[in-house]
């Protein structure tokens, strides 16, 4: 039975009074469980009342949205929308991962990077140099010139109180080199040349007018200025010497050897004479020349060793006394014009000429060490004087250990 418009309006779709099978209508009151696209900003859209039934077309669309995946929903929205702006807004709301990736900055090559670093360093250096140049040209920190002294006419100069010295600037101050203390002492004062005093009755000259002074011959600075001690100059006292040749050293040793040999022979012959020994030749061969043959007994060998030890001690005593008390020279060195001086440092100045520091006289301790090493090295079958061939300035091993050097007696200066 057909229903009128009023009755059809009062019942929801799918329901009638007669009963029977009816198709279920999905409810649209609750929100859908699946993701829905981002709503469009439409100012004319009005919210739907919760009790008002929806149209059949909307119910079918909602049922289809539940079954369609988001990708198909996006394709459907793109097909339905014809505006480019709405498509970009929907794509940005539904799939933000579809946005275009950001462009990375281009990587510089090694050559381009080096060029930019070099340019930056050059700009930094120019700025630093400009800053210091501007500070140096700034005259605010320059020390003022002292005011000229005035003297009364016809009278002597009136002594005035000395002006206080200008403040010294620290080395870290950029104006340090402008201070008078950084310029060093006056060369005329260092050389011992006094500044002429002003004449009474004459006023001072203008600062821009220079007095004409006749140049006078000046002797060496060392003669004009008083001699300074090494502690004042800050340098160690030294002296220049000439290094003797190997021939001079050898001849001096030979002279000392013959002198000591005659002393030894004199002592041995005196002992023989006092002992009443008749066989002088055999005794002399054993104890003077120290020759051993097949007839030498063990007792004679022991006596020879005792005599050799006494002889070495005599030689040590001879060199200790001569080098310590006789001006640093044995008779052989004295005849050849040689002497022994202390040497902590030796600097070569010219060929065969060295600066010896401190070049003082040899003490008794140094002389004892030198003599013992020299003589007992020979007794141990190692002649230490051969080492002068290997060390600088013809120094031997005992010279280096004792801190001495053999030079010519007359130094250069």
Swiss-Prot record:
Modified residues (Phosphoserine): 229
Its biological purpose: Plays a role in the assembly of the HRD1 complex, a complex involved in the ubiquitin-proteasome-dependent process of ER-associated degradation (ERAD).
Protein name, entry field: Protein FAM8A1
Residue stretches spanning the membrane: 257-277, 304-324, 371-391
Organism the protein comes from: Homo sapiens (Human)
Binding partners and assembly: Component of the HRD1 complex, which comprises at least SYNV1/HRD1, FAM8A1, HERPUD1/HERP, OS9, SEL1L and UBE2J1. This interaction stabilizes FAM8A1 protein, preventing its proteasomal degradation. FAM8A1 binding to SYNV1 may promote recruitment of HERPUD1 to the HRD1 complex.
Keyword Hydrolase: no
Highest taxon listed in the record's lineage: Eukaryota
PANTHER family attached to this UniProt entry: AUTOSOMAL HIGHLY CONSERVED PROTEIN, PROTEIN FAM8A1
Subcellular localization, as worded in the UniProt entry: Membrane
Keyword Isomerase attributed: no
GO biological process, one term: ERAD pathway
Membrane topology: Multi-pass membrane protein
Region of interest called Necessary and sufficient to interact with SYVN1, as start-end residue ranges on this chain: 107-139
């Amino acid at each position: 039975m057909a229903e009128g418009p009023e009755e059809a309006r009062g019942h929801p779709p799918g329901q009638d009074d007669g009963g029977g099978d009816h198709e279920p209508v999905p409810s649209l009151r609750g929100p859908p469980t699946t993701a829905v696209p981002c709503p469009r900003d439409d100012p004319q859209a009005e919210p739907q009342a919760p009790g008002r039934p929806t149209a059949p077309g909307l119910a079918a669309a909602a049922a289809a949205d539940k079954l369609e995946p988001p990708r198909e929903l996006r394709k459907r929205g793109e097909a339905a929308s014809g505006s480019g702006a709405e498509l970009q807004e929907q794509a940005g709301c539904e799939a933000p991962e579809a946005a275009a990736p950001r462009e990375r900055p281009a990587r510089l090559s090694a050559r381009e990077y080096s060029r930019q670093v070099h340019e930056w360093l050059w700009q930094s250096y120019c700025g630093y140099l400009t800053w210091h140049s501007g500070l140096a040209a700034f005259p605010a920190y320059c020390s003022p010139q002292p005011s000229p002294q005035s003297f009364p006419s016809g009278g002597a100069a009136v002594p005035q109180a000395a002006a206080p010295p200008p403040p010294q600037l620290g080395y870290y101050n950029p104006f340090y080199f402008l201070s008078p203390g950084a310029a060093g002492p006056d060369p005329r004062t260092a050389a011992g040349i006094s500044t002429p005093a002003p004449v009474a009755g004459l006023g001072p000259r203008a600062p821009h007018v220079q007095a004409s002074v006749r140049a006078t011959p000046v002797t060496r600075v060392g003669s004009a200025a008083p001699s300074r001690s090494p502690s004042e100059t800050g340098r160690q006292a030294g002296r220049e010497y000439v290094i003797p040749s190997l021939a001079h050293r050898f001849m001096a040793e030979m002279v000392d050897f013959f002198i000591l040999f005659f002393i030894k022979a004199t002592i041995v012959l005196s002992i023989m004479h006092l002992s009443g020994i008749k066989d002088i030749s055999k005794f002399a061969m054993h104890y003077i020349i120290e020759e051993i043959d097949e007839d030498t007994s063990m007792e004679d060998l022991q006596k020879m060793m005792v005599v050799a030890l006494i002889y070495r001690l005599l030689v040590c005593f001879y060199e200790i006394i001569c080098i310590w008390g006789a001006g640093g020279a044995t008779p052989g060195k004295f005849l050849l014009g040689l002497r022994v001086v202390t040497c902590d440092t030796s600097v070569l100045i010219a060929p065969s000429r060295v600066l010896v520091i401190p070049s003082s006289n040899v003490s008794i301790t140094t002389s004892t060490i030198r003599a013992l090493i020299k003589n007992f090295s020979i007794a141990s079958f190692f002649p230490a004087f051969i080492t002068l061939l290997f060390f600088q300035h013809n120094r031997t091993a005992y010279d280096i250990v004792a801190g001495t050097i053999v030079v010519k007696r007359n130094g250069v200066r």
